[in-house]
Amino acid sequence: MFFRLLTGAVTLVVCSTALGQTPLVSPAISYTRDIQPILTEKCVACHACNDAACQLNLGSAEGATRGASKVPVYQGDRTTAVAPTRIFYDAKGQQEWRNKGFYSVLDAQGAQAALMARMLELGHSAPLTPNAKLPEDIVLGLNRENVCPAPGEFNAYAQSHPKEGMPLAVTGLTDQQYSTVQTWLAQGAKVDQQAIKPTAVEAAQIAEWEELFNR
């Protein structure tokens, strides 16, 4: 009896020690839960509409994975037609967007971090003073000419635009937000997409609108 009790006690101590030495595993960063809310708060003011800067639409997972383009949506002096690049409509999947000239901002390029990671790092390394006048060399407004560097052109961009990291012309991400996004990018920027499911109230409202518009 004593031997059994002693054996049980030793086993309990060993198990307790092993559990105590087990490293805590941080929960995986979720695009839907952790990343999209940051992009919505800090990025979509410039990167959400059809005419978003560099056509980089960060209002949805589809836009983030589509990437950026050097071709502006609106060109007043254009004399020939250009194929539209409407998200959700004119291409499906990353490869179709790559065929239309879009390049990734989420994928690492060999030993180089993702373009988004480097843009955020550039902005984080040169923070702006809150509630202060913007530096003269940061040009904003309707006549601003957006520069849309591809991943291989980032070093030249950073050299000529040292104060124009992302987010542009604002105080930027908090340290926690910056750490979360950079960790997600370093881990491969996996995007978990969740289908939008309307609530019962929203579904009823949609049905009401459809009935109204179909009369």
Where are these regions (language model features)?
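Bacterial N-terminal signal peptides
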Residues: 4-17
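Aromatic- and Gly/Pro-enriched helix-to-coil junctions and flexible linker segments
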Residues: 19-215
